[in-house]
């Protein structure tokens, strides 16, 4: 999604060359370059450290299993967003986390940042109203049950492939 108007004054943006950046939207009224804006979200491969199982959830009446995910608040660190989203959606506390990778998700204009979130006490699990259903899966079964051809599947498969390379 490319913005057509300045987010400060509403003037129609033009295109202007910026050294080292190429063509960038420019506001002639503010005399400022306006770099594209997008959302930022985190998604998590949630792993129970005691069992090695992976949590997949269903949300909003949809039939497919996905990863826990949520938007990053303005000014919030990604690591905090991971812990906050896992706590808000599942009630569980993240013991430690590991950054995996990012991917831009065009349909929602969102930079998705994927992490592995390790929990030590799955008995804390207390899903909020955003979660319709959930299931803990072995890594192989998680791979089989996550929504096919989704960004969640791409993140999960990349994580599992990297883990398998370590063995």
Q: Which residues make up each language-model segment?
A:
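Residues immediately within or flanking Cys/His clusters that coordinate Zn2+
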Residues: 3-5, 24
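Conserved N-terminal beta-strand and adjoining loop/helix that marks the start
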Residues: 11, 22, 28-54, 71
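Short linker/helix segments within small regulatory modules
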Residues: 16-24
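Conserved beta-strand segments that form the floor/walls of ligand-binding pockets within enzyme
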Residues: 26, 66, 114
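Conserved Nudix-box catalytic region and its N-terminal flanking loop in Nudix hydrolases
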Residues: 47-88
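Unchanged
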Residues: 72-96, 101-155, 163
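Generic C-terminal helix-cap and adjacent flexible tail
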Residues: 161-167
